[in-house]
């Protein structure tokens, strides 16, 4: 690992590990380590051969035994802040007045263009001004008292409606007649009682920096580091390198006389640097000035002017280019990071972290999206909660609805059974019997001196791909209930046998592969062969195949030389045939023993078949086998799981409406008469419905509702299939394939036949979002807490997903459903705290507390990448970090505002007690704050780094503190310096920009050579 790439990653940690520890000298009792020193809490204790030394930390002053905070706001021209300077323990922070936002340098304040957002709330015209804005009206209108909306003028009468009223801002009619003028806040009424004079209280008087009120109006001044622009309001940076403006009467250098030339020959670089701004060199003809890289020499031959590199080809930057004095800086759009060449931008893979999304994370250029599994819905931008389908429209169930995790089920009352659509209930006596679905069947016979077995699945097949070289196949349904030997259409545990067995499959890896052999003939032969050894029907079968590699086996204690292979874990459910029970011969217990014996024999036969890799799956009209040693093309970089294809070097599941063909390695549309509503499947399910009606089918059906021949929404029939009738007036049906329609209730009717929603019912009042229509009282009722409604005119509210709830009643969308759990993981070395529902808005009236207790001789470093707390609440929402819960204990950090700029700081106490509270007012995104504990020997170095403004001055440095992947690497090495060697040279080159490495290297060298 050479020294070059070592420094490129993070030289400080390697140097700290090798130098600090090896250079330590033997000494007497370490009073600093024992805690017996008398150093102040804001001082650093350094052990000496005979005693110890106390030194106040950066940002504090004193003798080390007594330290007090330095108020940077009282020195150096308000701390360099152009508006307000807020002192905090050991540091300070600049803030801006209303109407301004903090510039990237953290000191200057720039105007906010309020008109960009929603036209500033103005009805007609929005005009931005320095520090504020104003609304104006079109011809024929005047501004109302709220200063945003416009009112049409009347041309008659002396009133405020007349455009001749003369008021500069607000016009009000007096009780005695006539008009009286008023001014907006921040303005004073002029002596003529009509006009309005601006003051510093409104938009800082239009001044960018400093405003002073005078009788004639505000006068603008600038901070000492800036100068006033010709407009009298704007402040620009002083160009200290620019020469003083020449006298207009002065002659040019070419016109000077010989005396001046002789004087030039007498100039020397030893006196006043020869008048050069930068580099001076003595020559035979006088001094010669030159400029450093990034500057160009001006015509006077002395002055240097900054080159704006961004003017030419955007400075070579992929995204943004920002010119700086003597240089420039490239930066990237949100969602991208700057590479080490400090020019190129690369997408940040937010999905790198498992906790980015609860279920599935889909990365995209500059962004990402969280996707939830079927039966779950997204809330809080990243979280997934179970959908309570029964909470709206009873889940579409005709009788009762039962919610389950990720799904739901409809149930029927006594005397009824479920229709094939699993929602309607039909009478059990008068309706034709629904045949039970075909069961999984195992057929085995002897071929070629061994057992050849087929598992046949005619329906209820489900395939899911796991990790590489693994899959799960389920076939059939749980054991059905029987009544008098007839299928009754429902399911229950029943009287059956359930067993689990594990099989090893030679050297083949798990991969559902369509067979190249003509297995159809062999399959039919196996069914009719008199030598068949097994023919067993199961109720339910689950097969999970997982490949085993040599490395994995040796890690688990098996022999390293054992060959690779696959292991299949099979779960069988075998129904006990009650017809075999006889009064005199064999009771139920006897029949169960016989069934168990048959099952054991079947498993032995199946084991032989699988060991010889002669086990095949037959479903959806195709045959599949366990693939043997896969021969892969040399140019295929990765192996995708079953149901996935390689697309742009990424494994992508086959979409809904398609299935995966293992033989061709492609996704195909579901054939007509079938559908598939899940991704990554290797077959399609057969559409329900009566046969022989000649109904045209379409390919690629994505769910059962797209199967042809079903009654459309607003229709019904006795079996849910054509021919269909429209729902009569007073009823509606939002789904396909139904046998009945829902009634509006409350004696309500609909405007026409064939209504598809309750919204078509003629209610007495239309309910707005956040309400539902009560058909008993014919009133709109606010949705209770924990529910929401997005649409107009509905008769239900939707329950919030999972364990979320709403802050108040009357919620109108799912984003108002929030998890109230205080997030975070508190580890001894690394961890994080997180506001509830992050990255969604946190709930109202919440209180969270965390306590970070590091191991002995370790200190805490905290990084706040960004925090969103609405200041409009007057600090009703706040985050505080201090030594303990006592209000007067030592405080490390406290805020009740939004800061998008990151900040890093060390704890002022050994332990941190953290509290977050919110009130019932506005809400925000909140925060996710990571921390690390480090060896206290590095306290001085860490504080020197985090207190240096250069760490935050560069946008690229700010993005590093926001990049979770980079911060995890930094924290990993800070917590465990030996982990530095876990990072390869390639990783080190791709992690940090050179400017960040240079910044850290200077700190390390100064720390090692004080």
UniProtKB/Swiss-Prot annotation:
Function: Lipid-binding protein required for SHH long-range signaling by binding to the dually lipid-modified SHH (ShhNp) and by promoting ShhNp mobilization, solubilization and release from the cell membrane. Acts by enhancing the proteolytic processing (shedding) of the lipid-modified N- and C- terminal of ShhNp at the cell surface. Synergizes with DISP1 to cause an increase in SHH secretion. Probable cell surface coreceptor for VEGFR2 involved in VEGFR2-mediated angiogenesis.
Post-translational modification: N-glycosylated.
Disruption-associated phenotype: Zebrafish 'you class' developmental mutants are grouped together based on the anormal U-shaped morphology of the somites. Homozygous zebrafish mutants show disruption of the formation of hedgehog-sensitive muscle fates, with an altered myotomal morphology from a characteristic chevron shape to a more rounded U-shaped. One of these 'you class' mutant results from disruption of the Scube2 gene. These mutants lack slow twitch muscle and muscle pionneer cells, and PTCH1 expression within the myotome and neural tube is essentially absent.
Protein name (record): Signal peptide, CUB and EGF-like domain-containing protein 2
Calcium in keyword set: yes
Keyword Ribosomal protein in record: no
PROSITE patterns linked to this entry: ASX_HYDROXYL, CUB, EGF_2, EGF_3, EGF_CA
Record's keyword terms, sorted: Calcium, Developmental protein, Disulfide bond, EGF-like domain, Glycoprotein, Repeat, Secreted, Signal
Signal sequence segment: 1-24
């Amino acid at each position: 690992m050479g020294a070059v790439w070592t420094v490129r990653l993070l030289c400080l940690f390697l140097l700290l590990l090798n130098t600090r520890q090896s250079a330590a000298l033997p000494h007497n009792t370490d009073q600093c380590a024992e805690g017996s020193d008398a150093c102040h809490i804001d001082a650093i204790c350094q052990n000496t051969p005979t005693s110890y030394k106390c030194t106040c930390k950066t940002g504090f002053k004193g003798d080390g035994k007594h330290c007090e905070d330095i108020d940077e706001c009282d020195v150096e021209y308000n701390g360099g802040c152009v508006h307000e300077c807020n002192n905090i323990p050991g540091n300070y922070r600049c803030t801006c007045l209303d109407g301004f936002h903090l510039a990237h340098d953290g000191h200057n304040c720039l105007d906010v263009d309020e008109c960009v957002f929603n036209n500033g709330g103005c009805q007609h015209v929005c005009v931005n001004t320095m520090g504020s804005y104003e609304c104006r009206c079109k011809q024929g209108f005047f501004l109302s008292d709220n200063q945003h909306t416009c009112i049409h003028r009347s041309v008659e009468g002396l009133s405020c409606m007349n455009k001749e009223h003369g008021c500069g801002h607000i016009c009000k009619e007096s009780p005695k007649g006539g008009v009286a003028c008023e001014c907006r806040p921040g303005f004073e009424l002029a002596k003529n009682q009509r006009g309005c004079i601006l003051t510093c209280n409104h938009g800082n008087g239009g001044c960018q920096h400093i405003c002073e009120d005078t009788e004639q109006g505000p006068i603008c001044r600038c901070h000492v580091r800036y100068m006033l622009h010709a407009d009298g309001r704007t402040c620009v940076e002083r160009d200290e390198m620019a020469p003083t403006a020449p006298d207009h009467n002065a002659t040019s250098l070419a016109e000077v006389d010989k005396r001046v030339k002789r004087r030039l020959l007498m100039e020397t670089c030893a006196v006043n640097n020869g008048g050069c701004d930068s580099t001076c060199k003595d020559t035979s003809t006088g001094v010669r000035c030159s400029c450093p890289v990034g500057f160009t020499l001006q015509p006077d031959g002395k002055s240097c002017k900054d080159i704006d590199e961004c003017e030419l080809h955007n400075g070579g930057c992929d995204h943004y280019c920002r010119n700086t004095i003597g240089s420039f800086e490239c930066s990237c759009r949100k969602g991208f990071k700057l590479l080490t060449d400090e020019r190129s931008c690369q997408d940040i893979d937010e999905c790198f972290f498992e906790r980015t999304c609860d279920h599935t994370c889909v990365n995209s250029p500059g962004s990402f999206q969280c996707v939830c599994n079927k039966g779950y819905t997204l809330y809080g931008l990243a979280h997934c909660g179970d959908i309570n389908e029964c909470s709206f429209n009873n889940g579409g169930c005709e009788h009762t609805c039962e919610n389950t995790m990720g799904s739901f089920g409809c149930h029927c009352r006594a005397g009824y059974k479920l229709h094939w659509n699993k929602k309607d209930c039909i009478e059990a006596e008068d309706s034709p019997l629904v045949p039970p679905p075909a069961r999984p069947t195992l057929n085995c016979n002897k071929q070629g001196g061994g057992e050849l077995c087929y598992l046949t699945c005619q329906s209820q097949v489900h395939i899911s791909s796991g990790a590489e070289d693994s899959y799960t196949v389920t076939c059939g349904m749980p054991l059905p209930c029987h009544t008098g030997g007839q299928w009754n259409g429902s399911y229950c545990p029943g009287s059956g046998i359930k067993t689990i067995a594990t099989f090893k499959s030679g050297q083949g890896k798990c991969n559902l592969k369509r067979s190249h052999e003509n297995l159809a003939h062999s399959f039919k032969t196996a069914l009719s062969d008199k030598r068949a050894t097994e023919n067993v029907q199961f109720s339910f079968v689950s097969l999970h195949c997982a490949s085993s590699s040599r490395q994995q086996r040796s890690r688990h204690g098996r022999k390293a030389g054992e060959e690779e292979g696959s292991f299949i874990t099979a779960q069988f459910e075998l129904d006990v045939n009650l017809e075999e029970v006889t009064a005199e011969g064999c009771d139920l217990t006897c029949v169960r023993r016989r069934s168990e014996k048959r099952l054991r024999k079947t498993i032995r036969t199946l084991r032989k078949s699988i060991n010889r890799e002669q086990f095949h799956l037959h479903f959806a009209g195709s045959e599949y086998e366990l693939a043997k040693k896969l021969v892969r093309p040399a140019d295929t970089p990765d192996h995708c799981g079953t149901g996935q294809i390689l697309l742009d070097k990424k494994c992508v599941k086959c979409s809904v409406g398609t299935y995966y063909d293992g033989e061709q390695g492609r996704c195909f549309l579901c054939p007509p008469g079938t559908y598939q509503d899940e991704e990554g499947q290797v077959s399609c399910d057969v559409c329900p419905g009566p046969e022989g009606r000649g109904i045209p089918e379409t390919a690629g059906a994505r769910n059962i509702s797209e199967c042809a021949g079903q009654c459309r929404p607003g229709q019904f029939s006795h079996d849910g299939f054509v021919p269909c009738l429209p729902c009569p007036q007073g009823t509606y049906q939002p789904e396909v394939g139904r046998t009945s329609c829902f009634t509006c209730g409350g004696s309500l009717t609909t405007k026409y036949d064939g209504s598809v929603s309750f919204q078509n019912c003629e209610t007495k009042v239309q309910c707005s979002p956040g309400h539902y229509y009560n058909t008993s009282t014919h009133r709109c009722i606010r949705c209770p807490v924990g529910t929401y409604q997005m649409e107009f005119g509905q008769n239900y509210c939707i329950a919030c997903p999972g364990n979320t709830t709403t802050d108040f009643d009357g919620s109108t969308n799912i984003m108002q459903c929030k998890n109230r759990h205080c997030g975070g993981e508190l580890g001894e070395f690394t961890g994080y705290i997180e506001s509830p529902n992050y990255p969604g808005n946190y709930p109202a009236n919440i209180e969270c507390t965390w306590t970070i207790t590091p191991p002995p001789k370790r200190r805490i470093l905290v990084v706040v990448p960004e925090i969103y707390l609405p200041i409009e609440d007057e600090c009703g929402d706040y985050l505080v970090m201090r030594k303990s819960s006592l209000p007067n204990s030592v405080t490390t950090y406290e805020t009740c505002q939004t800061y998008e700029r990151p900040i890093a700081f060390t704890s002022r106490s050994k332990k941190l007690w953290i509290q977050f509270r919110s009130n019932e007012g506005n809400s925000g995104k909140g925060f996710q704050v990571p921390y690390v504990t480090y060896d206290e020997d590095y306290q001085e170095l860490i504080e020197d780094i985090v207190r240096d403004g250069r760490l935050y001055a560069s946008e690229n440095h700010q993005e590093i503190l926001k990049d979770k992947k980079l911060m995890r690497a930094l924290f990993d090495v800070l917590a465990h310096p030996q982990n530095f060697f876990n990072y390869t040279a390639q990783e080190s080159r791709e992690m940090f920009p050179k400017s960040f490495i240079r910044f850290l290297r200077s700190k390390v060298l100064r720390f090692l050579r004080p």
